[in-house]
């Protein structure tokens, strides 16, 4: 993928708003041999059941109520789309392991933030991430944001030598969608509007 396109996408996304213009984002673009090496390290760590050391808390420590139900429904729908049964643990494992190869896309984006930044900056970061995703569509590209790519920051530091003053927030896949791939027909359901919005006229 041309570097010029990647640069243009990030150039457009960097106009995302941030509190007092802090612009807390820092991006590393990983391709080619570097991506292959890092993907191998991450997948090996996952398959060997290495304990994740994610620098940023992402999921709740205890799943409850509607969040637990949505998570379960999401997994069941994804596996049923792929024809993976509850009993087929190996195929489930292989599907999850693909996360660490960035689903074999040509570009892996990794996102870092200075350790001094607080919760508000992560909100800013979300706007930046979605701006990248929307900008990519303009160039016929697809994306997939991934928390999984942030689970082994020590291995990422080993390969990419990023500063100890920074945290690895997450990653993102960037590439051309394979429309013939079954997984790309999967869409997670969204809640009805009346379950998430209240009006006070």
Task: Explain the meaning of each model-derived region.
Residues 1-201:
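Acidic, surface-exposed loops and disordered segments
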């Amino acid at each position: 993928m041309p570097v010029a396109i990647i640069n243009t996408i990030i150039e457009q996304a960097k106009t995302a708003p941030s509190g007092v213009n802090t612009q807390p984002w820092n991006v590393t673009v990983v391709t080619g041999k570097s991506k292959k090496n890092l993907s191998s390290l991450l997948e090996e760590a996952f398959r060997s059941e290495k304990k994740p050391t994610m620098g940023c808390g992402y999921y709740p420590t205890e799943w409850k109520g509607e969040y637990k139900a949505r998570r379960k429904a999401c997994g069941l729908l994804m596996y049923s789309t792929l024809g993976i049964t509850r009993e087929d643990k190996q195929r489930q494992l292989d599907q999850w392991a693909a996360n660490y190869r960035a689903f074999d896309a040509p570009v892996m984006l990794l996102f870092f933030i200075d350790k001094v930044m607080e919760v508000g900056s992560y909100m800013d970061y979300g706007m930046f991430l979605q701006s990248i995703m929307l900008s990519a569509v303009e160039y016929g590209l697809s994306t997939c944001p991934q928390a999984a790519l942030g689970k082994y920051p020590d291995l990422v530091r080993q390969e990419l030598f990023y500063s100890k003053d920074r945290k690895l927030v997450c990653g993102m896949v960037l590439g051309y969608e394979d429309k013939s791939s079954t997984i790309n027909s999967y869409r997670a359901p969204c809640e009805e509007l009346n379950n998430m919005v209240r009006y006070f006229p």
